[in-house]
Structures are given as structure tokens and as C-alpha cells.
Amino acid sequence: MPLSSAHAPSRQAASRLIIATGNPGKLREFRALLVGLPFELNSLADIGAEPPEETGATFLANATLKARHAVTVAAATSSGVAAAAIADDSGLEVDALGGAPGVKSARYAGLGASDAANNAKLVAALAGVPPAERSARYRCVLVFMRGAADTEPLVAEAVWEGRILDVPRGSGGFGYDPYFWLPELGLSAAELDPARKNRLSHRGRAMQMLRDRLVARDWLTVPTCKHQG
């Protein structure tokens, strides 16, 4: 329902930022990428929340529902402490597979599938596909929501181009990283140190866009409904 003039929006500085992911690898990367922003960083576990079911058909839809879930739970349990949320939905798009696994990247081999199972299915799906036809990209869509009353969250999107290997390389990162080859570097994503990966990756690039927009738009605040009169 639109706000009436008697309930004009006011702004309250956010003191907490909920990182709306249940993925330990993403959580580590988010904590590194968010250094320097004026928030106490909380995970979903910190607010007693489980990740919601990802029912969206697009990365944007899933990122939005995850951010909305986090700020809604935080608002119900925060005792008046303002909280914003950041969520991403990201995945691998392989051209030879018509963009799969896409939004189903985390559950490509089934709900709750391990990274090893997802990678095994990917390798099997690409059996016989020559290296020149294994182009792929990681895509990340980030949503920053300033609170439960935020109807216009900030969105940033970035991609990371590469190719899919048929054998893994490296032991770092998570997900499909050991199979994600970066021709210009001669390395897989799993062979990059964390700091370098965060500078180059889809998530790192999207986060830099988001940080720039937060500063440019002065969005480091949380919208609230404050009765006037």
C-alpha cells in the first residue's frame, strides 16, 4: 500500500548487514568483499534464519527473494536495530548446454547435491565437446535491500568469461571453480588466490559496482515508516 502523507518515509542508518546466503564459500567471499562498509556483518545463522527455497526463474528473482527473506526475518527479531541485507544469485552458464546449469547451478545434480556431484554431471554433459566449444561464464546478480520497507532495492550484475575443462585444476574456491578455465591467465578459478579471485570474478565485479552505487546514491541507510503528526 502506498504511504500516505501522514506516514512519510524517513531514513535510519543501518547498523547491520545480513549476508543472505547459506553457502559457506559465498559467505567467505562476501565478508572479504564487504570490508570497509559501515555495517556489522551478520549471516543468516546469526539471525536464526534458514535460506529460503529458490523458486525464481531468474537470478534476479532469486536474489530478490533471498534479500527480502533476510530483511523480513531481521525486522521481526531485531528489537528495533536497523538491518539491511545483501543477497546474490549466481551460477554457471555453459553455451554448449544452452545456458545450463544456470539458476540451478547449486542443485544441478539434485537438491542438496555436493560440488563433486555437480561437477561430475557437468563433465558428463560435456563429454565429446571440443575445447573450442566449451565457452561459459559465471553470472552474478546482487541485490541490496535497505530494510523490510524497501521497495526499490539496488541491483548490480556482472559476468566472468571462461571455458570448461574436462579435468579439474587447483584446490581453491568452491563450486565449479576447478573446471572454470581462464584462457587469458592460463589458470583455473581454483588456482587463483582469494584476493585475486575477488578482483576478477563475477561476484567481485558486481560488488564493486554495488559499492560505487551505494556511495553515489547515499544508500547506506534503511527506509522506515515513521508516523508524523
Language model features with spans:
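Anionic-ligand binding patches
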Residues: P2-I18, G22-G229
